Design a protein with these regions (language model features):
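Short acidic/glycine-rich loops and adjacent helix/strand connectors
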Residues: 1-168
């Protein structure tokens, strides 16, 4: 959708979402009025859902509090980056990824995360409206960095695969 109002005659495209008709990530090429999808990642594997899980865990409302998590990121330290990489998400060199669903309940439960997630990050989710701690700031910084790294890998792979200079 970002391609059509763009000034480009041709461009690669990348779409990321929590879940949109089961596709969470797709990329491909757009020329004129034709789109060709080259790769898709499907639910439950989703960077948006990963980010929403951390939004929930930090005590914010899913689908409306993600901006708060992003706003906390600059105040944190990246002390959970390795934990996220080692346990929650497997990112390939091409930027494709899979979440370890052993830590998440959003696919079938009423919570975004589960007790195993709580154990990984030293306790239960922050209760909404309770004071923020350094833990939430560090979680925000860590998931922000992991998300950005994954998207940059995707972008590099898309550029290498398509040779296109423009990305929508």
């Amino acid at each position: 959708a970002a391609f059509y109002p763009s000034p480009f005659e041709s461009a690669a495209f990348l779409t990321l979402d929590g879940v949109g008709e089961w596709t969470t990530t797709s990329w491909g090429e757009a020329v004129g009025n034709h789109l060709r999808i080259r790769q898709e990642i499907r639910f439950p594997h989703s960077l948006g859902m990963l980010y929403s899980a951390f939004t929930y865990y930090a005590g914010f409302k899913v689908n409306s509090g993600e901006y708060k998590l992003m706003g906390l990121a600059p105040y944190g330290e990246p002390r959970f980056v390795d934990t996220i990489r080692d346990h929650l998400i497997d990112v390939k060199d091409d930027g494709s990824f899979r979440l370890n669903m052993d830590y998440f309940d959003y696919a079938a439960g009423l919570r975004m995360t589960n007790a195993k997630f709580d154990e990984l990050f030293d306790g239960p989710p922050r209760k909404p409206e309770s004071p923020l701690t350094q833990r939430e700031m560090d979680l925000a910084r860590s998931v922000q960095l992991v998300t950005e790294e994954c998207i940059l890998k995707l972008g590099r792979h898309i550029h290498a695969s398509t040779g296109m200079e423009n990305l929508c």
